[in-house]
């Protein structure tokens, strides 16, 4: 017997390619999207939303296709065997053993179901906050990375286990046509200056006005009241928004840009870097990071590296990374569209790691942490990718190799090296005989590891 269990807010149109009735295949089994849920997390300026699709599999069981840091996670319910720890015992960053596998807590925060549509399993309390905790598999290779979610909206808590997926790998059909997606009223007037603002991406949760650069929150859709913040001191991106470039064989479009400031906890000096949000319809999102010591391309990870040595080392995908920097970060300026509710003044604590050309970065708040992984890029490669070879000199950073000076230059370098060794020896002798020396200054720059650039949109549930 069906009965009315409450009244919900109307679903806001997130203009996703996904829709009810769309179908696909995973692990040799078909599925059809039959239900849609929208959740909210955070409060005030930190409020964000995500969408979760209920998938009915051909064997009659349920699964979920959910947003995850600009990508997707496909999750299935699993039995907890009564072993789910209380949410209070799962602080963010905590490592925990579950079912013989080690996980790291990536998110622990209250969420609220705000809207639902279609065929759905038992729903959490309507409009009432409940806690969702997400843990990500620790270490291992990329193919084995998993997301485990605990939904404390029911008793006992519901548990789902998922892995990262790409929509094109799911052989999906019945998706919204691109023309329908693009023509569905995605333009609105800027709440600050009245100029038209066009939203181009389905996943956007924040956007800036192209005229006055006001930052506008889209987390509640564009039909309601739009929260906004006027931005001063504009920062010009080196690569223009809308530019398309090919990096590592993949075509990316620049859809967002943010300038960030960092400061070591034991240092008064700050440093800055910029991050370009890149988008590919088949691959999702990535970050092109422009830092003092070079360029890098990074993407959020599904799992979490295994951190050892009191945070000094991180093991990921068969490699051991060493920590390069730890610092507080703050977003100072943004342009374009973003899939999370970015704002000026957002603060995180970051740690960067590196091994050779590969890099890892951890970004953490009180309720969430996000890992990203990638590699360094040559500045010429970045300039060529976006057809800016004539401006390549502007892309050069501290990691760039010196220009060849020929035989004479080689001799000069050898002389300089010898002089440096002599000076080092003199300094060592002076130190041995009681000479004192002062510590060096703080003229270091942020690693090019690339912090993720804001809050993630979650994992198995988000």
Q: Residue ranges of each PLM-predicted region?
A:
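Low-complexity, glycine/proline/serine-enriched intrinsically disordered segments
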Residues: 187, 374-462
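Short, surface-exposed polybasic-aromatic patches that bind anionic ligands, especially phosphate groups
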Residues: 1-18, 22-410
